[in-house]
UniProtKB/Swiss-Prot annotation:
The keyword Isomerase does not apply. Belongs to the enolase family. Catalyzes the reversible conversion of 2-phosphoglycerate (2-PG) into phosphoenolpyruvate (PEP). It is essential for the degradation of carbohydrates via glycolysis. GO terms for molecular function: magnesium ion binding; phosphopyruvate hydratase activity. (2R)-2-phosphoglycerate binds at Q163, K344, R373, S374, K395. Pfam families: Enolase_C, Enolase_N. Binds a second Mg(2+) ion via substrate during catalysis. The gene is eno. It is found in: Cytoplasm; Secreted; Cell surface. The active site is at E205, K344. Mg(2+) binds at D243, E292, D319. It comes from Streptococcus suis (strain 98HAH33). This is Enolase. It is an enzyme of class 4 (lyase).
Length: 435
């Protein structure tokens, strides 16, 4: 009854109006699962391949008909007949069918869509929530949200090199209250921006993209908004995080961090040592608890030096650096680079490999942050993954745009379903830092 009988993919649109995949999996019993695949704007060079058609006459070359065809005519034939509950076997079969180290033959987007749909169909068959199916009955930790309320870098037209400025309600008593705190700060920030005559249009992830005078101006305006909303900027209230996305402005030939790419003529150009000094200066000055991709994805010496300097005080998250890949994570653990990994399901391409990366991180004392992509859909699977793994942190955008809110609303539902069992750790989610 739990045998897969049909697999079907179609092309749909993501939050940027670009094509992506939606996959449906059906079983003998009538159980059904659907998965939708996100897409990134700033991508690590070591990520699994997102297969696009390349036909410029259709969707500007970004069509996904090849990936759809791979699901309907290649993957479907291979996994029909499998027990939908055997996630690992199905994921391994797809990996073997692809046969490349980066899923470049079938496309990680094709494989991931099936992987998510299979998990959802299995949960439907067993009549349990997805987070329970994926994580068992010890799933109880609601994640501390990283709310990206200022967008810069490749996510907006704002002249700021850092890609994301986030708020984290570490002092909130519950996820529900933390979400409320974040929403109130978001609206306070909008009011402040309007009063300054700055643009309040939002970027890809729902954050504002105003023309600030620089990074410090952005941070200080966020602190002003936190206080205007009635909260404390610090450990007892709301802290701040960055996604520097440094690979986006690292000049490989000159081996410098060239802020002029986003901030224009006269902006800083920093060596690795100067980049670390600058990040430390920001940490000393502001209530910052997490920095993502503070160094370029291939600047291993820089990462190790940054971790040695700040790794006990601040969460140092590897996104482009690790690309949710256990090979890169294992090297980072061995060499003492970073202390946290960003988890993006489409960077690696299957739920099995995603969970392996989270498990490896936790065993090494690294934190794991479950994350969206800038091109999202209404699919809320990452909310369930965050709870299923007791990850303790989620990064899924600002307090606007339905593609972001869908994940927050799913977490509210999960918190309600868990009732008194639900745990919101807040500041304690950063368990590897010295308090």
């Amino acid at each position: 009854m739990s045998i897969i009988t049909d697999v079907y993919a179609r092309e749909v649109l993501d939050s940027r109006g670009n094509p992506t995949l939606e996959v449906e999996v059906y079983t003998e019993s009538g159980a059904f699962g659907r998965g939708m695949v996100p897409s990134g704007a700033s991508t690590g060079e070591h990520e699994a391949v997102e297969l696009r058609d390349g036909d410029k006459s259709r969707y500007l070359g970004l069509g996904t008909q090849k990936a759809v065809d791979n699901v309907n005519n290649v993957i479907a034939d291979a996994i029909i007949g499998f027990d939908v509950r055997d996630q690992q076997a199905i994921d391994r079969a797809m990996i073997a069918l692809d046969g490349t180290p980066n899923k470049g033959k079938l496309g990680a987007n094709a494989i991931l869509g099936v992987s998510i749909a299979v998990a959802r169909a299995a949960a439907d068959y067993l009549e349990v929530p997805l987070y329970t199916y994926l994580g068992g009955f010890n799933t109880k930790v609601l994640p501390t949200p990283m709310m990206n309320i200022i967008n810069g870098g490749s996510h907006s037209d704002a002249p700021i090199a850092f890609q994301e400025f986030m708020i984290l309600p570490v002092g909130a008593p519950s996820f529900k209250e933390g979400l409320r705190w974040g929403a109130e700060v978001f609206h306070a920030l909008k009011k402040i921006l309007k009063a300054r005559g700055l643009v309040t249009a939002v970027g890809d992830e729902g954050g504002f993209a105003p023309k600030f005078e620089g990074t410090e101006d952005g941070v200080e305006t966020i602190i002003e908004a936190i206080e205007a909303a009635g909260y404390e900027a610090g450990e007892n209230g709301i802290m701040i995080g960055f996604d520097c996305a440094s690979s986006e402005f690292y000049d490989k030939e000159r081996k410098v961090y060239d802020y002029t790419k986003f901030e224009g003529e006269g902006a800083a150009v920093r060596t690795s040592a100067e980049q670390i000094d600058y990040l430390e200066e920001l940490v000393n000055k502001y209530p910052i608890i997490t920095i993502e991709d503070g160094m370029d994805e291939n600047d291993w010496d820089g990462w190790k030096a940054l971790t040695e300097r700040l790794g006990k005080r601040v969460q140092l998250v590897g996104d482009d650096f690790f690309v949710t890949n256990t090979d890169y994570l294992a090297r980072g653990i061995k060499e003492g680079a970073a202390n946290s990994i960003l988890i993006k399901v489409n960077q690696i391409g299957t739920l099995t490999e995603t969970f392996e990366a989270i498990e490896m991180a936790k065993e090494a004392g690294y934190t794991a942050v479950v994350s969206h992509r800038s091109g999202e859909t209404e699919d809320s699977t990452i909310a369930d993954i965050a709870v299923a793994t007791n990850a303790g942190q989620i990064k899924t955008g600002s307090l606007s745009r339905t593609d972001r809110i869908a994940k927050y609303n799913q977490l509210l539902r999960i918190e309600d379903q868990l009732g008194e069992v639900a745990v919101y750790k807040g500041l304690n989610s950063f368990y590897n830092l010295k308090k």
